[in-house]
Amino acid sequence: YKQCHKKGGHCFPKEVLICIPPSSDFGKMDCRWKRKCCKKRS
């Protein structure tokens, strides 16, 4: 997974499915933190 962040209600990059875990687990990007996942646009 690539890193992403939310800004202005949009996720960047918004064309891929990615997530950001809590900083304490920054090495693990397995998308179990659903609320921080950026979903691919339909």
UniProtKB/Swiss-Prot annotation:
Disulfide bonds: 4-37, 11-31, 19-38
Keyword Disulfide bond: yes
Tissue: Expressed by the venom gland.
Location within or outside the cell: Secreted
Listed GO CC annotations: extracellular region
Keyword annotations of the record: Antimicrobial, Disulfide bond, Ion channel impairing toxin, Myotoxin, Neurotoxin, Potassium channel impairing toxin, Secreted, Toxin, Voltage-gated potassium channel impairing toxin
GO biological process, one term: envenomation resulting in occlusion of the pore of voltage-gated potassium channel in another organism
GO molecular function: potassium channel regulator activity; toxin activity
InterPro entries hit by this protein: Myo_ane_neurotoxin_sf, Myotoxin
Statement: the UniProt record of this protein carries the keyword Disulfide bond: yes
A Pfam family hit: Myotoxins
Subunit structure: Monomer.
Family stated for the protein in its record: Belongs to the crotamine-myotoxin family.
Function of the protein: Cationic peptide that possesses multiple functions. It acts as a cell-penetrating peptide (CPP), and as a potent voltage-gated potassium channel (Kv) inhibitor. It exhibits antimicrobial activities, and hind limb paralysis. It also induces potent blockade of neuromuscular transmission in young chicken biventer cervicis preparation and potent myotoxic effect. In mice, it induces myonecrosis, upon intramuscular or subcutaneous injections.
Protein name: Crotamine-IV-3
